[in-house]
Amino acid sequence: VTKHDRQAAHRGIRQSMSGLHTWTGLLLGWVLYAMFLTGTVSFFKEELSQWMRPELPRVMQALDPAVVAQRVADEIGRIAPSATQWSIKLPEGRSNSVYAFWRLPVAQDARGFGEGHFDPVTGRQVEARGTLGGDFFYRFHFQFYYMSPFWGRLLAGLAAMFMLIAIVAGVITHKKIFTDFFTFRWGKGQRSWLDAHNALSVFGLPFHVMITYTGLVTLMALYVPWGERAAIKTPAERQQLMAELNAFIPPGNPAADAALLGSIEAMVRQAQMRWGTSDVGRVNAANPGNAAARIAVTRGDAGRVSMSPDYLEFDGVSGKLLSVHDRVGAAAETRGVLYALHIGRFSDLETRWLYFIVSFMGTAMVGTGLVMWTVKRRQKLPDPERPCFGFRLVERLNIASIAGLSIAMTAFLWANRLLPTAMADRAFWEIHVFFIVWGLTLLHALLRPARAAWVEQLWAAAGLLALIPVLNAMTTQRPLWHSFAVGDWVFVGTDLMCWMLALLHAVLAIRTARQGARVRPPRSLAKRDALPTMSGEAAT
């Protein structure tokens, strides 16, 4: 085998990987972009949820979780005395309220459950506007909406697999990828798009691999269920598996005798002696108000690089510690660590910002890859002014998926401030607004020339984002100047971030419009001298 043969074989492998990289990145690229962007926002979902519920009081001082848990448990006992189960999520520094969920007999409530937010200072339920807050983006990024969560998660897993293949193929394809990381040629059309794509890819390459692989691991039992089905044969084995994956109270029949719950505060105190004063995340109850009551006190996520369950189980009446669940098998612990790396709940503020920034770069990596596909292929079209249907479809989907998604996410925030607070099914109507606006951006992209659609939608996103602080000042008692004066940094940070994102979209709109204003070359020179813009159209 000669040197020439080896070089030819190497080129053949790289060319094959190039095609694999291109098509795995494109076919589900629009889904991946939406997953990346909504996942990026989800790193601050607790803060976004606070902003979307301005009625909830701002908590100024650190509170004792044991006292808060007792207050809220007493309140649930008052407002839902027939609840068969309840769960209290305690604030861990990033939340200004306590969230609780309880199950009710169907005869009493057609839904079969109740939920609410509680003031940690008083323990009383707070009437806040109906919204999913940041949890909508969190859920959307791995199970989407308007479809069964099962099929949504399968689609997300398929997209993640495509992403992992595209990353590996991209590294093989770009033999000088690390060298090109230090090279950026501004204003060079296709070369500039490739340089930006390479830089965004290489800078966050370890993160992109980690976040994609760990995303698959979190739902591994859904994607590869056969091993679990073969290993788990009995209900007892199923319960043991559940206990290794979540805080799990074995289901039991209520006893014939009613009995008051023991001191929740005392049970939480026992947990604090093991984990620390502020490291309690949740309190669950089964059969409260019954002699068979059980209480589980679960450790919080902060500062713990594992999502494996760590909890204490108590007799709900006597308060006696029944069992300690602080160890799981090697496989479950590996899964717990990878899950924790994916969602980053262990992180402090600085680490969370690092997650956000690198994930935002991953979003841009996917976006530049989608745009580069149209940039490269327009030059190869027989008539770039009259592209084929497939090319036009990709181009319009790019516009709606990138610029249109920014508009839709911003419209979701606008709906939060403008919809009547007493509106029925308000939380769902916020989501409906998101999808209605997103659909309208696709319609707009189909009806307008590509470059005009890019510019108009980028400007629309910039304008809507820039006006959010104004809208917030007009519709709540927490405008930017007041929030800054009292140190309400969640509201300050949200308003400032909206302005920063508005500036980013404005810069992109201006640059795309300037490219479009350049004079076109003669058709005979177009192929040789084309300088593609964001829409992929030639300009010089």
Where are the regions a protein language model picked out?
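Conserved histidines in hydrophobic membrane contexts and catalytic metal-binding motifs
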Residues: V1-T540
